[in-house]
A protein has these predicted regions:
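Bacterial N-terminal signal peptides that target proteins for export
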Residues: 2-9
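Short, low-complexity, Pro/Ser/Thr/Gly-rich segments in the mature regions of secreted, periplasmic
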Residues: 135-146
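Bacterial lipoprotein signal-peptidase II cleavage site
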Residues: 23-31
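Iron-sulfur (Fe-S) cluster-binding segments and ferredoxin-like electron-carrier domains
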Residues: 82-103
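Post-signal peptide N-terminal segment of mature Sec-exported envelope proteins
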Residues: 31-51
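Extracytoplasmic/periplasm-facing segments of secreted or lipoprotein envelope proteins
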Residues: 48-87
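Functional cores of ribonucleases/endoribonucleases
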Residues: 102-135
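C-terminal motif of bacterial Sec signal peptides marking the signal peptidase cleavage site
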Residues: 19-21
Length: 147
């Protein structure tokens, strides 16, 4: 009996320590912790902010296009995308004709934003003209530009 009393007392003591040690502290000081990037105030005058905005616009365009499968090249077209500092597009991108109106608006917005970025930060480029594709072919359900 004395032995079981010691076992139960030890078990109760260990349980109490476990419960109190795992409890979260509500009064923790979070001022020294790093701020999540989404919670940080946007510094709209910084180059990094503008680069991130360009990347976001480009990824929106690419993800919208990636939703569509290429089964017939006649259902696809291509457009110039981006703006080199000394003129001309950065690249060409294939897009499905069925979303032509919305995607061309996004591509034009991206190109205009890149042109403004180039002027704002005095960006220089290689000034090489990018060859315009001669067509599109479907490969693995993805549109591939033909040069």
């Amino acid at each position: 009996m004395k032995n079981s009393l010691i076992k139960y007392s030890a078990l109760a003591l260990i349980s109490a320590f476990t419960m109190t040690s795992c409890a979260s502290s509500k009064s923790a000081d979070n001022t020294n912790l790093p701020i999540d990037i989404l919670d940080r105030p946007a510094d709209e005058s910084s180059k990094k902010y503008d680069e991130a905005n360009l990347d976001k616009l480009k990824s929106i365009i690419e993800s919208e296009i990636a939703k569509e499968k290429c089964t017939s090249s006649s259902d696809w077209a291509f457009a110039p995308m981006g703006a080199k500092a000394c003129g001309g597009p950065v690249s060409y991108i294939a897009y499905p004709k069925k979303i032509e109106t919305s995607i061309l608006t996004r591509i034009e917005n991206y190109t205009q934003t890149m042109s403004e970025f180039n002027k704002k930060y005095s960006i220089t480029s290689d000034c090489m003209m990018i060859a315009e594709p001669s067509g599109i072919r479907c490969q693995g359900e993805k549109a591939v530009l033909i040069y």
